[in-house]
Amino acid sequence: MRAMQMKGYGGSEQLQLVELAQPLPQSGKVLVRVHCASVNPVDWKRASGALRLIMPMRFPAVPGYDVAGDVVSMGAGVGGFSVGMRVHARIADMNAGGCADYAIVGAAELVAMPDGMPYDVAAALPLAGMTALQGLRDGAGLPMAAAAGTRVLVVGASGGVGHIGVQIAKQAGAWVTGVCSGANAPRVRELGADEVLDYTRGDAFNGVAPFDVVLDCVGGDPGPWLRLMTAQARYVSVIPGPMTFIWPLLNPFSRRRVKPWMLKTNADDLRYLDGLWQRGSLKVIIDDRYPLPSLGQAWQRSISGRAVGKIVIEVA
């Protein structure tokens, strides 16, 4: 089978298209014929070595956490799936392996795709969608059906996690403000944002009422957002930086909560997101699609920070 592989830490230049033996699913695992995968910033950040202290890689490595495809075979003890079933998942294994013709996925991570969901959308949704959902619901404590009156600020509202976060917060009943460039503001408004702030304008944040929840999908420093937060606000960063951990130590008596959020793969959460999509309550924006051998170019697009929504890798 074809796979994009890295043999050591580095950038996209380290990616090579190689031929590997088709893997066999062990107990509790499922072999999936991958139709689409998707790019997440954690892919190239881990590959660069920037996260090696907390998320080391084993080489050679095949990147790619998100997959959508068809069940080929199942290991011992796997139930609830059948050969040919259309499925998608966020692979929980630290070495992932989604950017290949076939991928091994834990049965507990795998979810049947809703009728009518295309493979590209199914591959774009898992990691970004679950991160947004968990960051708001679990990290910030936003009630999913009773958030009326809560003011939510989504920083990076046009990105992979952010554009889904805007919609989830809106579905919960919150007043949602998105932060993005002026060029992307119309798209974020289309997703349901009540207000959009253009971060490129120096006066964009003047006179803005404070927020109860800040979902930061860009950086890990609560400092720039403190003046826009209520006294008991919850700040959650899905890209934790040093200050996400240090700020609570420096401000032990503050009623504001600052929290880093790391995704926990949860099939029930993916099913919840699938339900939103099926009801027409969630749109998954795809910035661009690249063939498997062009994974390096897809990474460069992600690194540029200009992608709107998710970047998809077309495998089959």
Each PLM stretch: what is its role?
Residues 21-39, 51-94:
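Glycine-rich beta-strand-centered segment in the early N-terminal region that forms part
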Residues 82, 123-198:
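Mid-domain Rossmann-like dinucleotide-binding core that forms the NAD(H)/NADP(H) cofactor-binding site
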Residues 88, 214-215, 236:
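N-terminal Rossmann-like NAD(P) cofactor-binding module of classical short-chain dehydrogenase/reductase
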Residues 94-107:
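A structural motif shared across PLP-dependent enzymes of the aminotransferase-like
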Residues 206-213:
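A short acidic, Gly/Pro-enriched loop at the edge of an enzyme's catalytic core
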Residues 220-282, 315-316:
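Glycine-rich phosphate-binding loop and adjacent beta-alpha segment
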Residues 267-316:
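C-terminal hydrophobic helical "lid"/dimerization subdomain
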